[in-house]
């Protein structure tokens, strides 16, 4: 009785993400298109994504050829390899990039990595550099602090990191979310006006009959730092990305943001968590516990049993970009609990207190999606039985790198560049916890909500003892041991020129510190511009090409065989408990 595919409405393209919400932050019901939206089963990619992929996969070839032309693969010519197989895009490498959570640390470290991968960055296409990998990628996923990075890039017309860093209007992290954009060169407003705008936006949504949560305030305030528009881009929607002329033409990767489903009071563990995905066209989950998607543009509409009843309007504007970034990072809602210790107007403090009084402090991290688009859809589950859907920070299940959307077999991703800015150790450096959680969820669990192909990884102690958390490591090099799994290039945060292990809950950074962490992130991705290993660009190229070599029956070049011996985890385990982890600067 349920349709497997829904045709998404098409609108004339525009040049950028835009404030296309009908009434700012307030969702509004409108006349539905002639083909009314409905929920679809998650049995395949949407028709919109399938169509877009035809353009995107072909558009990655030139950037990939240019990158490979600069790396030394010995007698093997990587650029010619791409050219020789260009008639069959499915034979070519399909690249995903995943940027972890970790607050502003993740935005800045991840931003440095994307800066390194971007051929628009000054000097990034010189010898030993990695520029062009971003332009070669099909997908770019972000979670929590990583979603701020991804969202800021796409809400600002796919801006490069250097432009966002130098713009002066955004990324002014010396401004606290409690004070507003007082030092933005374009949008500087007084703190009183800032709070007036915050309250007005959220009140508008509430007065229209929609339940609000602390996430609404958090997402709104965050947007002032991330979106270069008046009132923090109050009318910018995530679905407007799909209307961008450049995006429709496949000139940039597809952005994906992740959140976790959590019923109030529920404890999340990786095996049972339902992972929700926001992409430019849809919102939903591939997991067995739901396996359904809704048109993102019409999120907020009153669906029941997968359809809109006759007379129900199509609601637009619910998918506010800041609300989506805030949902993915809802752990930071607790920052607003510090509001009582600030000079915030009493009316704002009262609004926060009223929400806490309603939901209880133990649920202060939830984002409320009501009406629940999946209400009474198909088989009954905790996500279809309630008229409200509650989501939380995408890293609360310990899967702090947003790998889930890139592991979906329908997307055929060959290689994932996984940038990990997690604070796993007591000294706030990564130790592989996110990869372990994803492995246990999909491969090593008796109660799986998901069973996606994923390569074997060692335990966290081994990550530290073998130094796998201090330099890039390849997992899944031998595809015969991980059928259908992508090769994962793990790129953990490490100190090159600056101790970038700042606290997840540090909410202010002066410009010098911001720039130093971004530059350190560039070094994390490039191994200090090749200073640590001059072969790194070639080895990363080998990882990118590996699964493609298998599909085309190409003999692995000697250079790549050497690289794989250096960077592939060889299965060694050392699970003894390590001492405290205090890495030193790699570049002095």
From Swiss-Prot:
<feature type="glycosylation site" description="N-linked (GlcNAc...) asparagine">
    <location>
        <position position="529"/>
    </location>
</feature>
<dbReference type="GO" id="GO:0005829">
    <property type="term" value="C:cytosol"/>
</dbReference>
<feature type="glycosylation site" description="N-linked (GlcNAc...) asparagine">
    <location>
        <position position="157"/>
    </location>
</feature>
<comment type="similarity">
    <text>Belongs to the lysophospholipase family.</text>
</comment>
<feature type="glycosylation site" description="N-linked (GlcNAc...) asparagine">
    <location>
        <position position="574"/>
    </location>
</feature>
<feature type="glycosylation site" description="N-linked (GlcNAc...) asparagine">
    <location>
        <position position="41"/>
    </location>
</feature>
<dbReference type="GO" id="GO:0004623">
    <property type="term" value="F:phospholipase A2 activity"/>
</dbReference>
<feature type="glycosylation site" description="N-linked (GlcNAc...) asparagine">
    <location>
        <position position="501"/>
    </location>
</feature>
<keyword id="KW-0325">Glycoprotein</keyword>
<keyword id="KW-0442">Lipid degradation</keyword>
<dbReference type="InterPro" id="IPR002642">
    <property type="entry name" value="LysoPLipase_cat_dom"/>
</dbReference>
<feature type="glycosylation site" description="N-linked (GlcNAc...) asparagine">
    <location>
        <position position="302"/>
    </location>
</feature>
<feature type="glycosylation site" description="N-linked (GlcNAc...) asparagine">
    <location>
        <position position="119"/>
    </location>
</feature>
<feature type="glycosylation site" description="N-linked (GlcNAc...) asparagine">
    <location>
        <position position="58"/>
    </location>
</feature>
<dbReference type="InterPro" id="IPR016035">
    <property type="entry name" value="Acyl_Trfase/lysoPLipase"/>
</dbReference>
<dbReference type="Pfam" id="PF01735">
    <property type="entry name" value="PLA2_B"/>
</dbReference>
<feature type="domain" description="PLA2c">
    <location>
        <begin position="31"/>
        <end position="574"/>
    </location>
</feature>
<comment type="function">
    <text>Catalyzes the release of fatty acids from lysophospholipids.</text>
</comment>
<feature type="glycosylation site" description="N-linked (GlcNAc...) asparagine">
    <location>
        <position position="431"/>
    </location>
</feature>
<keyword id="KW-0378">Hydrolase</keyword>
<feature type="glycosylation site" description="N-linked (GlcNAc...) asparagine">
    <location>
        <position position="88"/>
    </location>
</feature>
<feature type="region of interest" description="Disordered">
    <location>
        <begin position="15"/>
        <end position="38"/>
    </location>
</feature>
<dbReference type="GO" id="GO:0046475">
    <property type="term" value="P:glycerophospholipid catabolic process"/>
</dbReference>
<protein>
    <recommendedName>
        <fullName>Lysophospholipase 2</fullName>
        <ecNumber>3.1.1.5</ecNumber>
    </recommendedName>
</protein>
<feature type="glycosylation site" description="N-linked (GlcNAc...) asparagine">
    <location>
        <position position="449"/>
    </location>
</feature>
<feature type="glycosylation site" description="N-linked (GlcNAc...) asparagine">
    <location>
        <position position="123"/>
    </location>
</feature>
<feature type="glycosylation site" description="N-linked (GlcNAc...) asparagine">
    <location>
        <position position="228"/>
    </location>
</feature>
<feature type="glycosylation site" description="N-linked (GlcNAc...) asparagine">
    <location>
        <position position="84"/>
    </location>
</feature>
<feature type="glycosylation site" description="N-linked (GlcNAc...) asparagine">
    <location>
        <position position="478"/>
    </location>
</feature>
<feature type="glycosylation site" description="N-linked (GlcNAc...) asparagine">
    <location>
        <position position="510"/>
    </location>
</feature>
<feature type="glycosylation site" description="N-linked (GlcNAc...) asparagine">
    <location>
        <position position="167"/>
    </location>
</feature>
<feature type="glycosylation site" description="N-linked (GlcNAc...) asparagine">
    <location>
        <position position="481"/>
    </location>
</feature>
<keyword id="KW-0443">Lipid metabolism</keyword>
<dbReference type="GO" id="GO:0005783">
    <property type="term" value="C:endoplasmic reticulum"/>
</dbReference>
<dbReference type="GO" id="GO:0004622">
    <property type="term" value="F:lysophospholipase activity"/>
</dbReference>
<feature type="glycosylation site" description="N-linked (GlcNAc...) asparagine">
    <location>
        <position position="77"/>
    </location>
</feature>
<feature type="glycosylation site" description="N-linked (GlcNAc...) asparagine">
    <location>
        <position position="553"/>
    </location>
</feature>
<feature type="glycosylation site" description="N-linked (GlcNAc...) asparagine">
    <location>
        <position position="570"/>
    </location>
</feature>
<feature type="glycosylation site" description="N-linked (GlcNAc...) asparagine">
    <location>
        <position position="340"/>
    </location>
</feature>
<feature type="glycosylation site" description="N-linked (GlcNAc...) asparagine">
    <location>
        <position position="272"/>
    </location>
</feature>
């Amino acid at each position: 009785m349920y349709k497997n595919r829904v045709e998404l409405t098409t609108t004339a393209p525009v040049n950028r993400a835009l404030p296309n919400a009908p009434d700012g932050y307030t969702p509004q019901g409108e006349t539905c298109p002639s083909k009314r939206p409905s929920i679809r089963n998650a049995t395949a990619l949407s028709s919109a994504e399938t169509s877009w992929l035809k353009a995107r996969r072909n558009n990655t070839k030139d950037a990939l050829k240019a990158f490979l032309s600069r790396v030394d693969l010995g007698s093997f010519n990587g650029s010619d390899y791409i050219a020789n197989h260009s008639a069959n895009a499915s034979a070519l490498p399909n690249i995903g990039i995943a940027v972890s959570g970790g607050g502003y640390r993740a935005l800045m470290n991840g931003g440095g990595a994307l800066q390194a991968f971007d051929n628009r960055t000054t000097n990034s296409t010189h010898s030993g550099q990695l520029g062009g990998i971003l332009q070669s990628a099909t997908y770019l996923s972000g979670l929590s602090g990583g979603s701020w990075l991804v969202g800021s890039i796409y809400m600002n017309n796919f801006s490069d990191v250097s432009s966002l860093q130098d713009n002066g209007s955004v990324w002014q992290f010396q401004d606290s979310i409690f004070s507003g954009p007082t030092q933005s060169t374009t949008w500087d407003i007084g703190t009183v006006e800032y709070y007036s705008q915050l309250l007005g936006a959220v009140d508008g949504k509430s007065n229209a009959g929609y339940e609000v949560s602390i996430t609404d305030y958090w997402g709104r305030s965050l947007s002032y730092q991330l979106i270069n528009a008046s009132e923090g881009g109050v009318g910018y929607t995530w679905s407007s990305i799909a209307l961008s002329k450049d995006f429709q033409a496949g000139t940039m990767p597809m952005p994906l943001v992740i959140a976790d489903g959590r019923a109030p009071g529920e404890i999340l563990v990786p095996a049972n968590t339902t992972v929700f995905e926001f992409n430019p066209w849809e919102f939903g989950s591939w997991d067995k516990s739901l396996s359904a998607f809704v048109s993102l543009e019409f999120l907020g509409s009153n669906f029941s049993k997968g359809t809109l009843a006759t007379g129900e309007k199509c609601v637009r504007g619910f998918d506010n970009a800041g609300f989506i970034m805030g949902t993915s990072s809802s752990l930071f809602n607790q920052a607003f609990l510090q509001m009582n210790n600030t000079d915030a107007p009493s009316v704002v403090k009262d609004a926060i207190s009223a929400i806490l009084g309603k939901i209880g402090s133990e649920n202060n991290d939830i984002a409320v999606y009501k009406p629940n688009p999946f209400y009474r859809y198909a088989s009954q589950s905790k996500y279809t039985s309630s008229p409200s859907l509650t989501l939380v920070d995408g890293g609360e299940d310990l899967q702090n790198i947003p790998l889930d959307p890139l592991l979906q077999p329908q997307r055929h991703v060959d290689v994932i560049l996984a940038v990990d800015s997690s604070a796993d150790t007591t000294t706030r450096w990564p130790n592989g916890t996110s990869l372990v959680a994803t492995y246990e969820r999909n491969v090593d669990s008796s109660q799986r909500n998901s069973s996606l192909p994923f390569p074997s990884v060692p335990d966290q102690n081994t990550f530290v003892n073998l130094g796998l958390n201090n330099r890039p490591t390849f997992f899944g090099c031998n595809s015969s041991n991980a059928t259908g799994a992508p090769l994962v290039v793990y790129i953990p945060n490490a100190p090159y020129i600056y101790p970038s292990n700042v606290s997840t809950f540090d909410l202010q950074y002066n410009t010098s510190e911001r720039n130093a962490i971004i530059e350190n992130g560039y070094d994390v991705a490039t191994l200090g511009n090749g200073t640590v290993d001059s072969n790194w660009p070639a080895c990363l190229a080998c990882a990118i090409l590996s699964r493609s070599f298998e599909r085309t029956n190409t003999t692995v070049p000697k250079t790549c065989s050497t690289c794989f011996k250096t960077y592939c985890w060889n299965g060694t385990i050392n699970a003894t408990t390590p001492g405290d982890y205090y890495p030193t600067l790699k570049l002095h």
